[in-house]
């Protein structure tokens, strides 16, 4: 008789399974708060692992970037093609306070602007705001027919393209360097910079569909908690009052 393991007796031990733990039981939901320049403040929720040991949930949340449509931020469906990036800079309780981190157009909007028989003109420039943010702004514009034009093509000459691009540089630099980040974001939404470029280029070649279609933050100043709270419309008065106490000289002891 061959000596060996009886396979029939060991069959019952194979069916042991590990207990499955739902990973969501170890996570918490946090509310994302948009700056006060937007109409809607509660823009969504984000998920993070709970604080345990040396790992803090707040550290995992800080620096997280979320992308939200401007239609959701301002309750305006006409602005659905603009995407706003917000960066979580501070966590207070279950609220994540964010700041503007970038803006871009959706790809379908950009593709819808490009048409035949016209010239596309692009420009980008690095500019610093008054509060120390270094941004790169990207502008785009298209030529259009003059009022009395019969020809269907609206191609601009190379010299005209250079002049229009120079106007784009000057206007973007002037508009961005004369205001802080909050005021600059408020210029993006009604497309105030695009209208200025369109007006300035009228004497060179008429333009249409002029937009600042992208904005990137290249460098941010040192984090300031009071400025972030001011951006969210919260109280920043944390300075205490100095306590003045009359000094009394101790009496001299006759014996120790």
Curated annotation (Swiss-Prot):
SMART domains: Ribosomal_S3Ae (SM01397). Keywords: Acetylation, Cytoplasm, Ribonucleoprotein, Ribosomal protein. GO terms for cellular component: cytosolic small ribosomal subunit. Pfam families: Ribosomal_S3Ae. One of its GO terms (biological process) is translation. The keyword Iron-sulfur does not apply. It is found in: Cytoplasm. InterPro entries: Ribosomal_eS1, Ribosomal_eS1_CS, Ribosomal_eS1_euk. GO terms for molecular function: structural constituent of ribosome. It comes from the Eukaryota. The modification N-acetylalanine is found at residue 2. Belongs to the eukaryotic ribosomal protein eS1 family. Component of the small ribosomal subunit. Mature ribosomes consist of a small (40S) and a large (60S) subunit. The 40S subunit contains about 33 different proteins and 1 molecule of RNA (18S). The 60S subunit contains about 49 different proteins and 3 molecules of RNA (25S, 5.8S and 5S). This is Small ribosomal subunit protein eS1. The gene is RPS1.
